[in-house]
């Protein structure tokens, strides 16, 4: 029976499931009335960590019997093939679960169908929602074995507590609304969650409030049991820094990029010493443009704009040098960055696309190079993303799925 299978796989499920899959399961089970709204809210709000949510969800479903458990298992098989392989689950045509026995201890069992898929795709296979490609265990182990002295170590999933911070300013008192920023925020949050980070999201802040959030984030105790962090800033900007929501010609509400590095350095955030700290900045860095389009920079561009264009632009200052940092900015100094009101920012869109496609096999700097190359093409000459102040001493592999 499905409930017995689910009970047998409870521990593996708790240790392996991602927050994205948990959220998908909750939505599915609510829609099919396996869970009611109160149960769903309890699972989401009464539990802090992903593992706690997973444990509570699994226990709720198994108590409801085989039919509820079968819906749970079927969703995993259909939507998260990586997790289904780890749990050794298959959903047959009759909706009965087939329990697949493990051939060898310590191995990573894949079905013949999955193995064929791995060979075709060079080892990767889609993660939740068919998006992020996860790294098969044997490939992760091979990379680590051959290059461990040159790779930042990652902590084990059950005990690590990765955190990420996203600050997104959309609505301003004196500047235009950043239409399309909601797409960037949603997609970036989902990506980081699938990479194993608990994401803290803060919206529409002044420079002072952004500094306060940085201070609180740097002090989070979870960093002690984390192996890395991401900080993502999306706002209007100019050469001096990132605009707060009250910026105007009279009010210099600007977060200097140096402040970000100072708040996250070894002195202010010792828990992240010798661990990768990745800073992503989507904002303008000045007024110059390679083409003439609507933009998000604060000042007036000397080059004007095209009235029929639907792109808009966004900016920052050079980063402060610190060990184990890497900053990836949406444009070169003094230039604008562009945002589509429906698709979101060109930079964020390309970054997410390449992270999903290559994080399983490439280190972060190599992924960033691929993003830059995507803007080199003739139809993408609007901006050139820039990697700056790189003080990483090793290669940073994300090993998605592990």
Swiss-Prot record:
Record-linked Gene3D superfamilies: 3.40.50.1460, Death Domain, Fas
Gene Ontology, cellular component aspect: AIM2 inflammasome complex; canonical inflammasome complex; cytoplasm; cytosol; extracellular region; IPAF inflammasome complex; mitochondrion; NLRP1 inflammasome complex
Biological process per Gene Ontology, one example term: cytokine precursor processing
Record PTM: The two subunits are derived from the precursor sequence by an autocatalytic mechanism. Ubiquitinated via 'Lys-11'-linked polyubiquitination. Deubiquitinated by USP8.
Residue stretches making up the CARD domain: 1-91
Residue ranges listed under propeptide: 1-118, 297-314
Residues carrying Phosphoserine: 301
Function: Thiol protease involved in a variety of inflammatory processes by proteolytically cleaving other proteins, such as the precursors of the inflammatory cytokines interleukin-1 beta (IL1B) and interleukin 18 (IL18) as well as the pyroptosis inducer Gasdermin-D (GSDMD), into active mature peptides.
The UniProt record lists the keyword Protease: yes
Stored SUPFAM superfamilies: Caspase-like (SSF52129), DEATH domain (SSF47986)
Residues annotated as catalytic: 236, 284
Subunit structure: Heterotetramer that consists of two anti-parallel arranged heterodimers, each one formed by a 20 kDa (Caspase-1 subunit p20) and a 10 kDa (Caspase-1 subunit p10) subunit. May be a component of the inflammasome, a protein complex which also includes PYCARD, CARD8 and NLRP2 and whose function would be the activation of pro-inflammatory caspases. Component of the AIM2 PANoptosome complex, a multiprotein complex that drives inflammatory cell death (PANoptosis). Both the p10 and p20 subunits interact with MEFV. Interacts with CARD17P/INCA and CARD18.
EC number(s) per entry: 3.4.22.36
GO MF annotation list: CARD domain binding; cysteine-type endopeptidase activity; cytokine binding; endopeptidase activity; identical protein binding; kinase binding; peptidase activity; scaffold protein binding
UniProt entry keywords in alphabetical sequence: Apoptosis, Cell membrane, Cytoplasm, Hydrolase, Membrane, Phosphoprotein, Protease, Thiol protease, Ubl conjugation, Zymogen
Catalytic activity: Strict requirement for an Asp residue at position P1 and has a preferred cleavage sequence of Tyr-Val-Ala-Asp-|-
Organism: Rattus norvegicus
Listed name of the protein: Caspase-1
């Amino acid at each position: 029976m499905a409930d017995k299978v689910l009970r047998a796989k409870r521990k593996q499920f708790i240790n392996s499931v991602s927050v994205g899959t948990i959220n998908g399961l909750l939505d599915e089970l609510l829609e099919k009335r396996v869970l009611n709204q109160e149960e769903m809210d309890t699972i989401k709000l009464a539990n802090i960590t992903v593992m706690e949510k997973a444990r509570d969800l699994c226990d709720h479903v198994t108590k409801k019997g085989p039919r509820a458990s079968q819906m749970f298992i079927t969703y995993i098989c259909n939507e998260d093939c990586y997790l289904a392989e780890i749990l050794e689950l298959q959903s047959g045509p009759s909706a009965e679960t087939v329990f697949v026995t493990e051939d060898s201890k310590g191995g990573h069992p894949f079905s013949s169908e999955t193995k064929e898929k791995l060979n075709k795709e060079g080892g990767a296979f889609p993660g939740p929602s068919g998006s992020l490609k996860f790294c098969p265990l044997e490939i992760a182990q091979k990379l680590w074995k051959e290059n461990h002295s040159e790779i930042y170590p990652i902590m084990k999933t059950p005990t690590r507590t990765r955190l990420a911070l996203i600050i997104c300013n959309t609505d301003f008192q004196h500047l235009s609304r950043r239409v399309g920023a909601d797409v960037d925020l949603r997609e970036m949050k989902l990506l980081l969650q699938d990479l194993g980070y608990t994401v803290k999201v803060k919206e529409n802040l002044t420079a002072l409030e952004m500094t306060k959030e940085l201070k609180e984030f740097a002090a989070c105790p979870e960093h002690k049991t984390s192996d890395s962090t991401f900080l993502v800033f999306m706002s209007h900007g100019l050469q001096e820094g990132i605009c707060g929501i009250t910026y105007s010609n009279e009010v210099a509400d600007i977060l200097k990029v140096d402040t970000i590095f100072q708040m996250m350095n070894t002195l202010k955030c010792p828990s992240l010493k010798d661990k990768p700290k990745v800073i992503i900045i989507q904002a303008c860095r000045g007024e110059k443009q390679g083409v003439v389009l609507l933009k998000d920079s604060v000042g007036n561009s000397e080059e004007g704009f095209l009235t029929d264009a639907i792109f808009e632009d966004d900016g920052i200052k050079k980063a402060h040098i610190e060990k184990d940092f890497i900053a990836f900015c949406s444009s070169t100094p003094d230039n604008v960055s562009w945002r589509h009101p429906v698709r979101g920012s060109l930079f964020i869109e390309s970054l997410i696309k390449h992270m999903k496609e290559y994080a399983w096999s490439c280190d972060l700097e190599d992924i960033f190079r691929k993003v830059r190359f995507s803007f080199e093409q003739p139809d993408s000459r609007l901006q050139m993303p820039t990697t700056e102040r790189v003080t990483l001493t090793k290669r940073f592999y994300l090993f998605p799925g592990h």
